[in-house]
């Protein structure tokens, strides 16, 4: 450190200034004060002769520390990933504490035991409640029968998208329908029905009293009831002559009985277009209805041999070489057949396209 000594020159007075004794005393007093201050500063410098060198050394050290910090930042960026890998490795396995994933083998075993007993207790409670629930529910009769919709319908033979397309002169186009009908009607063979079921009087419900777990008897529905659509008189079910047979059945509903003792009937017509496209339909049985003797249905557990009644539609005179949309509906009291969102409740729509 370099010190600048103040000038010892006497103070200058302005031009024309008249010298007075008081002014001289004041100037002398200021001069002596400056001299004392300079003497004190020189004494401090003499007492600490290496102060300037120490200050320079401190400044040099600060510069070196700044350079080292800059170099350390560059090196820390390269070694950061290595430190992270070391931390992960110690977390996976710490050989000093013999811990893996921050847990010892003993603590893991204890946790497994706790979870085992917890889930075992939970499973036991759930099983107990399910068992009690099944004790309160009858397997033979549905609990909420009022939520069941009116019966839906299905047809046989099975047809993709409910479109019956075939050529009378090409058996390979309609043979699959014949095979489907023959397979479906095997359970309706007369000999099998006479062996398993009983002959019930028509026109009234077949109500069977007794315990709900008691086996129920079923009424016969013979294949011969379908006459020209039974496959007994015409093995091709009319497909070889362009007069196809289609079978319709209602879905089974436990406890269902047609209201007011009137049987449910079937009616088919052109769904959209010229009504004369279908000029003649024969129904089998001739009443075109599901007889009351097949109701009520008691469920598959007790009504083992129950056979669903059928109604066959024999389309004897249908316009050829064009698609004819057909709608078959169930009709009776309590039957719903106009649900827009479900075309299988009380009705079904299919297409006939018979080529010659």
Swiss-Prot record:
A Pfam family reported for this protein in Swiss-Prot or TrEMBL: Na_K-ATPase
Gene Ontology BP terms: potassium ion transport; regulation of DNA-templated transcription; sodium ion transport
ATP-binding found in the keyword field: no
Perinuclear space topological segments: 131-356
Disordered: annotated span: 26-78
Compositional bias annotation for Acidic residues: 33-43, 51-72
Location(s), subcellular: Nucleus inner membrane
Tissue spec: Expressed in skeletal muscle (at protein level). Expressed during postnatal development in skeletal muscle and heart.
InterPro entries associated with the record: Na/K_ATPase_sub_beta, Na/K_ATPase_sub_beta_sf
Primary location recorded for the protein, binned into one broad class: nucleus
Entry keyword set: Membrane, Nucleus, Signal-anchor, Transcription, Transcription regulation, Transmembrane, Transmembrane helix
UniProt keyword Transit peptide, yes or no: no
UniProt membrane topology term: Single-pass type II membrane protein
Family: Belongs to the X(+)/potassium ATPases subunit beta family.
Subunit field text: Associates with a SMAD7-transcriptional complex. Interacts with TOR1AIP1. Does not associate with known Na,K-ATPase alpha-subunits. Interacts with SNW1.
UniProt function note: May act as a transcriptional coregulator during muscle development through its interaction with SNW1. Has lost its ancestral function as a Na,K-ATPase beta-subunit.
PANTHER family tied to this protein: PROTEIN ATP1B4, SODIUM/POTASSIUM-DEPENDENT ATPASE BETA SUBUNIT
Protein name: Protein ATP1B4
Natural source organism: Mus musculus
Species lineage: Eukaryota, Metazoa, Chordata, Craniata, Vertebrata
């Amino acid at each position: 450190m370099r010190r600048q000594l103040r000038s010892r020159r006497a103070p200058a007075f302005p031009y024309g200034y008249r010298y007075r004794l008081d002014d001289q005393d004041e100037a002398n007093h200021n001069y002596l004060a400056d001299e004392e201050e300079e003497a004190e500063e020189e004494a401090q410098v003499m007492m600490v002769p290496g102060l300037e060198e120490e200050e320079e050394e401190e400044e040099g050290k600060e510069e070196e520390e700044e350079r080292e910090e800059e170099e350390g930042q560059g090196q820390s960026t390269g070694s950061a990933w290595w430190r992270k890998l070391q931390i992960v490795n110690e977390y996976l396995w710490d050989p000093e504490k013999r811990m893996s994933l921050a847990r010892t083998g003993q603590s893991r075993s204890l946790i497994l035991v706790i979870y085992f007993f917890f889930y075992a207790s939970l499973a036991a409670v759930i099983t107990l409640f399910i068992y009690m629930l099944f004790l309160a529910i009858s397997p033979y009769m549905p609990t909420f029968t009022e939520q069941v919709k009116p019966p839906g319908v299905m047809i046989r033979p099975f047809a993709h998208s409910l479109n019956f397309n075939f050529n009378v002169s090409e058996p390979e186009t309609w043979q699959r329908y014949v095979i489907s009908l023959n397979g479906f009607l095997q359970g309706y063979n007369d000999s099998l029905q006479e062996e398993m079921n009983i002959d019930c009087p028509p026109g009234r419900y077949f109500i069977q009293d007794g315990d709900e777990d008691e086996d129920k008897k079923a009424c016969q529905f013979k294949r011969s009831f379908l006459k020209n659509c039974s496959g007994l008189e015409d093995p091709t079910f009319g497909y070889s002559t362009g007069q196809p047979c289609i079978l319709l059945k209602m879905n089974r509903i436990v406890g269902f009985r047609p209201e007011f003792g009137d049987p449910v009937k079937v009616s088919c017509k052109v769904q959209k277009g010229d009504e004369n496209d279908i000029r003649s339909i024969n129904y089998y049985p001739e009443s075109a209805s599901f007889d009351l003797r097949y109701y009520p249905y008691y469920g598959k557990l007790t009504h083992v041999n129950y056979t669903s009644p059928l109604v066959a539609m024999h389309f004897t005179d249908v316009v050829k070489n064009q698609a004819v949309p057909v709608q078959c509906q169930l009709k009776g009291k309590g039957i719903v057949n106009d649900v827009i969102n479900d075309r299988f409740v009380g009705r079904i729509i299919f297409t006939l396209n018979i080529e010659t």
